[in-house]
Swiss-Prot record:
Belongs to the GatC family. Allows the formation of correctly charged Asn-tRNA(Asn) or Gln-tRNA(Gln) through the transamidation of misacylated Asp-tRNA(Asn) or Glu-tRNA(Gln) in organisms which lack either or both of asparaginyl-tRNA or glutaminyl-tRNA synthetases. The reaction takes place in the presence of glutamine and ATP through an activated phospho-Asp-tRNA(Asn) or phospho-Glu-tRNA(Gln). GO terms for molecular function: asparaginyl-tRNA synthase (glutamine-hydrolyzing) activity; ATP binding; glutaminyl-tRNA synthase (glutamine-hydrolyzing) activity. This is Aspartyl/glutamyl-tRNA(Asn/Gln) amidotransferase subunit C. GO terms for biological process: glutaminyl-tRNAGln biosynthesis via transamidation; regulation of translational fidelity; translation. Keywords: ATP-binding, Ligase, Nucleotide-binding, Protein biosynthesis.
Amino acid sequence: MALTLQDVEHVARLARLRLSPAELEKMRDQLSNILDHFQMLQQIDVSAVPPTAQVTDLVNVLREDEIRPSLPHEQALANAPEQQDGMFRVRAIFEEE
């Protein structure tokens, strides 16, 4: 699957990456190769293979919640493109009723 430079620029923008023109070309080739491999995998007939969610029989080992120091507020917001009242500001994705 051949990606365009615009596709790669879009993905880079979503990931907040600044790529040079040479890096965009390199990423386009690499991402196109990855998508080609996925297309090959999609052609494999797995209808006779039973669905499997987990193969090791491991179970979750949970611990009690405990309050511990976390990332400082300023550091957590350092790379946020928009902030408001000390919180991340993001576009609304739900319609108000």
